[in-house]
Amino acid sequence: MSYINKEGKTTAWRVMTVRQQVSAVLSYGKIQTTLKKAKNTQKRLEKIITIAKVDNFNNRRAVKKWLLNTNSLDVDQLTNHLFKKVAPRFLKRNGGYSRVLKLGVRRGDSTEMAILQLIDATN
């Protein structure tokens, strides 16, 4: 993950950014962010959804440590949403639960932007 390890950014900042973005994707279905942050967040999101496919106490605890409160859901509601609505959509799918769509560059600083979204797998 050398592409996300920038000068002046601490490990705590990087971990918190991933936690915020994972929570937002699970809450809203998609987010718009920079390409590098989207790719970094996608890795953790895939692992969290894979863990959530089996609903037990230990898996809920493992997932909860990566989630944060969002504007619409708190951590407990977000965990229930993940285990009851999001993960069952992907039971027959082995990975590839999300995708990164490139949007082009941001006007202000020419940073590549992207959308990170969950794939709508209903079967």
Curated annotation (Swiss-Prot):
GO molecular function: structural constituent of ribosome
Keywords per UniProt: Ribonucleoprotein, Ribosomal protein
SUPFAM superfamilies linked to this entry: Prokaryotic ribosomal protein L17
UniProt cross-references to PROSITE patterns, sorted A to Z: RIBOSOMAL_L17
Coiled-coil region(s): none
Statement: the UniProt record of this protein carries the keyword Nucleotidyltransferase: no
Keyword Ribonucleoprotein: yes
GO cellular component term, pick one: cytosolic large ribosomal subunit
GO biological process: translation
Similarity comment: Belongs to the bacterial ribosomal protein bL17 family.
NCBIfam families attached to this UniProt entry: L17
Subunit structure: Part of the 50S ribosomal subunit. Contacts protein L32.
Name of the protein in its database record: Large ribosomal subunit protein bL17
Annotated source species: Mycoplasma genitalium (strain ATCC 33530 / DSM 19775 / NCTC 10195 / G37)
Taxon lineage: Bacteria, Bacillati, Mycoplasmatota, Mycoplasmoidales, Mycoplasmoidaceae
